[in-house]
Amino acid sequence: MKLAVIGAMEEEVTILRSKLKDAKQEMIAHCEFTTGSYEGVEVILLKSGIGKVNAAISTTLLLDRFKPDYVINTGSAGGFHHTLNVGDVVISTDVRHHDVDVTAFDYEYGQVPGLPAAYKADEKLISITEEAVSELNGIQVAKGTIATGDSFMNDPKRVEDVRAKFADLYAVEMEAAAVAQVCHQFKTPFVVIRALSDIAGKESDVSFDKFLEQAAVHSTELVLNVIKRIH
């Protein structure tokens, strides 16, 4: 069993890296890959860099060179659903682009031509993640749609524009749809596990700086519990 875990920033991968046994690092095209094992599972940890282009490049390298059986994209996100608070964790049911618009040619908003409007997370990985939640104390976990764009969502108008397009959106961030799109094209099962560092549009830049570390801890705790169950 070979599992890949992708985080964009150092804060999002540092805890998991420290847990890997016999860890070895390799830089490929400015992307940092760390291979090792955790609880008997072979793990490839990728620090992708921020944004959709970085995520797509690094995920393509990951899937082509390391050929993992499953992919988990983890890290922080901005909360969108009214029930969520900073520190909560969102598990993806599906992932969409929130900054793609070719509706003039009869595609759905967020749909890249020739590809699905939504990238469905793997049901087995969702189920394992839900089981893994049971070991976490004091962390609220929700399941729903995550949307991706190359903008940090601290502008209330931008937040409302995106909210108007997606009625039941749980979280927004800057890499997951790119990861999901590449996984779709490689036919590799994936799930996204994101902890909320901020609530989109509500002084989110201040909240992000303050709560990024907490979000990283929460998301990594859940990822580690998933790895234990993924044999």
UniProtKB/Swiss-Prot annotation:
Family: Belongs to the PNP/UDP phosphorylase family. MtnN subfamily.
Record: active site: E12 (proton acceptor), D198 (proton donor)
NCBIfam families on file: MTA_SAH-Nsdase (TIGR01704), PRK05584.1 (NF004079)
Binding-site list for substrate: G78, M153, M174, E175
Alphabetized Pfam families for the sequence: PNP_UDP_1
Name of the protein this chain belongs to: 5'-methylthioadenosine/S-adenosylhomocysteine nucleosidase
Catalytic activity: S-adenosyl-L-homocysteine + H2O = S-(5-deoxy-D-ribos-5-yl)-L-homocysteine + adenine; S-methyl-5'-thioadenosine + H2O = 5-(methylsulfanyl)-D-ribose + adenine; 5'-deoxyadenosine + H2O = 5-deoxy-D-ribose + adenine
Pathway(s) the chain acts in: Amino-acid biosynthesis; L-methionine biosynthesis via salvage pathway; S-methyl-5-thio-alpha-D-ribose 1-phosphate from S-methyl-5'-thioadenosine (hydrolase route): step 1/2
Superkingdom classification of source: Bacteria
Gene of this entry: mtnN
Organism expressing this protein natively: Bacillus velezensis (strain DSM 23117 / BGSC 10A6 / LMG 26770 / FZB42)
Molecular function GO terms recorded: adenosylhomocysteine nucleosidase activity; methylthioadenosine nucleosidase activity
Enzyme class (EC, first level): hydrolase
Function as written in the Swiss-Prot or TrEMBL entry: Catalyzes the irreversible cleavage of the glycosidic bond in both 5'-methylthioadenosine (MTA) and S-adenosylhomocysteine (SAH/AdoHcy) to adenine and the corresponding thioribose, 5'-methylthioribose and S-ribosylhomocysteine, respectively. Also cleaves 5'-deoxyadenosine, a toxic by-product of radical S-adenosylmethionine (SAM) enzymes, into 5-deoxyribose and adenine.
Keywords for the protein's UniProt record, in alphabetical order: Amino-acid biosynthesis, Hydrolase, Methionine biosynthesis
Gene Ontology BP terms: L-methionine salvage from methylthioadenosine; L-methionine salvage from S-adenosylmethionine; nucleoside catabolic process
GO cellular component, one term: cytosol
EC number: 3.2.2.9
